[in-house]
Amino acid sequence: MPLKLTRRQYAEMFGPTVGDRVRLADTDLLVEVERDLIAEGGGYGNEIKFGGGKVIRDGMGQSPTARDADSLDLIITNALILDSRLGVIKADLGIKHGLIVGIGHGGNPGIQSGLGSTFVDPRTGKKNPMIVGAATEVIAGEGCIVTAGGIDTHIHFICPQQIEEAISSGITTMLGGGTGPATGTFATTCTPGAWNLRRMIEAAEAYPMNLGFLAKGNCGTPAPLREQVLAGAIGLKLHEDWGTTPAAIDVCLGVADEFDVQVAIHTDTLNEAGFVEATIRAFKGRTIHTFHSEGAGGGHAPDIIRVCGEPNVLPSSTNPTRPFTVNTIDEHLDMLMVCHHLDTKIPEDVAFAESRIRPETIAAEDCLHDLGAISIMSSDSQAMGRVGEVIIRTWQTAHKMKQQFGALAGGAHPAADNFRALRYLAKYTINPAIAQGIAHVVGSLEVGKLADLVLFKPALFGVKPELVLKGGFIAWANMGDPNASIPTPQPTFYRPQFGAAGRALTSTSLTFVSQAALDHGTFRDAGLARRLEPVKHCRRIGKRDMVLNDALPHIEVDPETYTVKADGRVLTCEPARELPMAQRYFLF
């Protein structure tokens, strides 16, 4: 006679199933399970679970005959998967050779039916059978949320310790520029020149993080830019502190089109070489990734935010303005003076700073995120941004917008707050991956991609991960006292794991470079251990390709009042006085 469980008992044992709702941390956001691939495959009662007296034992949920070649290397059981491409689904997740090979139902085909991946592996054209054997490790995903590792596309590589902060928050890919605590790096995300690029690519070997470097894009002639792409740069960065003139923009985009790399831009705050209209004309309809598109982080004052309505622009935010709060304005003035080498004793420097910090456009930025008109979130690490808070501030913004404007209608994901949750998740996972040409390997949990995964307990979602996997191997974890008799005694804090050590580190992390550099043989004798992965498909993309964030409103900014309108409607909201995912999580 089958055992009957209440819905609560089932959720406590095997995790939530279709129709169950899960709160994300202490926000007002609820996600509802849309599909249960385990139940669809083998039916309820056919789940597998590890532990004493549980299912994954020899001859039961574990095959006694499966050889290594046929078995998963790792299975995450009964996980709640949150992914902007896949939706909100319950499934087992199978990993082999560092890649996601199956999402569905795993176990022992000798005694279980309905096993295997729901999705085809693009490398084989087949669905993986998801066999658990003697070669298979297990992570219990029951009651956990699994997302793809986060991607931060706006990194000032000022110090290597940023990587520890970022991975502790759930970021697994960092893209940007710099050479350490140099004055140029404090302000601009550029690793200029072949020699500096080689040193940073060599340094990347030491860290459990996918890394890629932008070169300096401000140059009036193409030859110096070509040299940097051939040296391994994944893209070019135009920054106003180096002179972002229409001529420099035009040359830079021309080289990017030639080599299929992305261009990121921080536009001309002072409007010295032209207004926002001149910059948009210089784009000539070519793809470009605009950093801190609201303008507090830099850009044409007061109306750079207009670019969020251009079809060729991939707009991103940086996290200090996310979300708009009662403290945002005061904090930004001090940050800006430091980061851009300004002097409080020089009136022109003070005026420059004040021109960039506008409550009206920051409030509109909240609204544009909720509309899906700003597609990407990033940090601007140590240069007016916090590298460990991309994920937190994304979800704080989503919470604030639900509080102020209510539920967000979404046709494909109408249940609970699924549509809003997936829209905001896309801003730090799949959309930055698409923008920077790395979506073929990271950015989602789709079968065939690198197994860069983050596991959260729902109460700690977006704030403090339990585990961070790089290339299918645990690299970082919330770990207790190493001298304790069990893993959990306090103090628990983030510690590097075996995936962050030795050759396991270089086997499970990627360094992104240009295809041109690989074709040119730039790294043939470089002695690098990490896999070099080329960026691709950077140029013929646009806002239409931004997952769940492809809105193209016509945006206007009043030059006197800074009021922002989208399609004729004023965009504004009140600053938050209280936020979730804040002090209650960081008392110690």
UniProtKB/Swiss-Prot annotation:
It is found in: Cytoplasm. Keywords: Cytoplasm, Hydrolase, Metal-binding, Nickel. The modification N6-carboxylysine is found at K237. Residues 149-588 form the Urease domain. Ni(2+) 1 binds at H154, H156, K237, D380. Substrate binds at H239. It comes from the Bacteria. The active site is at H340 (proton donor). Its cofactor is Ni cation. Its EC number is 3.5.1.5. One of its GO terms (biological process) is urea catabolic process. Pfam families: Amidohydro_1 (PF01979), Urease_alpha (PF00449). It catalyses: urea + 2 H2O + H(+) = hydrogencarbonate + 2 NH4(+). Pathway: Nitrogen metabolism; urea degradation; CO(2) and NH(3) from urea (urease route): step 1/1. GO terms for molecular function: nickel cation binding; urease activity. One of its GO terms (cellular component) is cytoplasm. Ni(2+) 2 binds at K237, H266, H292. Its main location: cytoplasm. Binds 2 nickel ions per subunit. Carboxylation allows a single lysine to coordinate two nickel ions. PANTHER family: UREASE. Heterotrimer of UreA (gamma), UreB (beta) and UreC (alpha) subunits. Three heterotrimers associate to form the active enzyme. Belongs to the metallo-dependent hydrolases superfamily. Urease alpha subunit family. This is Urease subunit alpha. The lineage of its organism: Bacteria, Pseudomonadati, Verrucomicrobiota, Opitutia, Opitutales.
